[in-house]
Amino acid sequence: MSSSEGVVHVAFLPSAGMGHLNPFLRLAATFIRYGCKVTLITPKPTVSLAESNLISRFCSSFPHQVTQLDLNLVSVDPTTVDTIDPFFLQFETIRRSLHLLPPILSLLSTPLSAFIYDITLITPLLSVIEKLSCPSYLYFTSSARMFSFFARVSVLSASNPGQTPSSFIGDDGVKIPGFTSPIPRSSVPPAILQASSNLFQRIMLEDSANVTKLNNGVFINSFEELEGEALAALNGGKVLEGLPPVYGVGPLMACEYEKGDEEGQKGCMSSIVKWLDEQSKGSVVYVSLGNRTETRREQIKDMALGLIECGYGFLWVVKLKRVDKEDEEGLEEVLGSELSSKVKEKGVVVKEFVDQVEILGHPSVGGFLSHGGWNSVTETVWKGVPCLSWPQHSDQKMSAEVIRMSGMGIWPEEWGWGTQDVVKGDEIAKRIKEMMSNESLRVKAGELKEAALKAAGVGGSCEVTIKRQIEEWKRNAQAN
């Protein structure tokens, strides 16, 4: 067995950003609930303070089940990497530091039963995985739809040697066997479609070509009722020949350790919940466009006008700075005193990190204006809240498509990416009204909530999949 007591021991290696880290820790917590021992390998330093705090709270919550090992990253000259995005730079820094991983793994006192690593680390990990005496698994932290695109890119690239995706992805989009319709070119992450080579594009092409190598399976935070078509296509061998099994282990539940223990955050949530308690059922729009990209000043003004005009109460999380830097100006400086006063009359505006799951679960919240980050998608499904999607970057248009196809949300494609043209306040108000007044969205959201609870509950697909993997790892250990 993998230890003297026969306990399954799983190592997790996440990548950069809360969008990657949070689902990794939720998956690790799920394995812990079923009796596994976890080693968390943490690249240091992290990009943001939020990541460091979350790792600390996770490890403190499971002191007897989790061993934390730091992967101290090598120094990388930013001028040698063609990106200004701090998270893309961190991806590359981690990739260049993976030669340091074997000595770290050698420190483990009990053998590994399995090694689970982030999708952004495939190629540089091959030489490490080759020497491991345990199965290895990818964890794809976005949708099954996005993973299908990722896997299919390797086929397209091999058929078009020497070409960039901007050349071989045409106006008719990406046709994926098993999908009823192609993925539109307009939904492909912009960095991939740049005519000139860039870091994100190179990582995508390099790793998609190696996705079938030394890989025993792929975990995805999704489930049949939400992404049945994509999961069936992936596991039916239609998307990519030789692809290992893809396991839908979602929706992964939020955990108690995710709640911030900082006094400022506790105070912020306390005042938010008090205000929500005073609102009528389903009357509040929750607005959050993610914590990775700041909202442009001109768009903030039109967002404010739209929220005032929509006629509903609102809780608006405003991001004025990238990552976790302190905002140097208040909302009043951006909006002006008159507009700022009107906003405060109608709703609540915060700049701090909030407990999104708690907010979405509050009875007064009737709709979510979201960027479509995959964590946010699974959380809104988990709580059964209709969604208005406004993708900001990367894979978020594909997430918006999942929400729209599910029947629990709307996606105004004409808004484009959040970094493009300013969407006017009257258009924002119109779409919020459409979401909040649409009973069919609410009914479908409720149905998906029930399906999510069933999938994550006793005897559900998530539990069955996790337990099956654990038993397989135990058999492997006995055979060895």
Curated annotation (Swiss-Prot):
Pfam families documented for this protein: UDPGT
Catalyzed reactions per annotation: a 3'-hydro-2'-hydroxy-beta-oxodihydrochalcone + UDP-alpha-D-glucose = a 3'-(beta-D-glucopyranosyl)-2'-hydroxy-beta-oxodihydrochalcone + UDP + H(+)
CDD domains: GT1_Gtf-like
Effect of substituting residue 20 to A: Loss of C-glucosyltransferase activity, but acquisition of O-glucosyltransferase activity
Enzyme Commission code(s) on record: 2.4.1.360
Sites where the protein binds UDP-alpha-D-glucose: 141, 354, 356, 371, 374-376, 379, 395-396
Functional summary from the UniProt entry: UDP-glucose-dependent glucosyltransferase catalyzing the c-glucosylation of the A ring of 2-hydroxynaringenin. Also active toward phloretin, but not toward naringenin and apigenin.
UniProt family annotation: Belongs to the UDP-glycosyltransferase family.
The protein's name in its UniProt record: UDP-glycosyltransferase 708D1
Organism this protein belongs to: Glycine max
Gene behind the chain: UGT708D1
